[in-house]
């Protein structure tokens, strides 16, 4: 069994994925982490990398192929990613939604924790986070419609 977890930024995907993986004693694969690593290799923030992806499909290709391969070769795992359900269609799909203001509060609180660097922006206020979430959502939506027709 494969469980894919998707949802709006700040909806608790990572929290739920970690809890499920721990409870089931299954591995957890985090696609957001792979995208952040790829952005870092190019000297970009995740926001810049996502923006680049609107005109360069290669920014998604590595993670997309990785997800497909996982779905074909492995079983009994949790995968967390905005498009994981699409690339592993036989997975059990969980979608988490959240009010945008609540999402911004969750993310802002997370960024305030001691060990979390604000890697993507200089997000100093809740309003900055709300704006960042909206920009990310629109960028992701554009890429997903353009490249995956979803």
Regions found by a protein language model. Give the residues of each.
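Conserved phosphate-donor/acceptor-positioning beta-strand/loop module used by diverse small-molecule
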Residues: 89-114, 122-125, 132
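ATP-binding Walker
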Residues: 11
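Walker A/P-loop
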Residues: 14
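P-loop (Walker A) phosphate-binding loop of NTP-binding proteins
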Residues: 8
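Hydrophobic anchor at the beta1->P-loop junction of P-loop NTPases
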Residues: 5
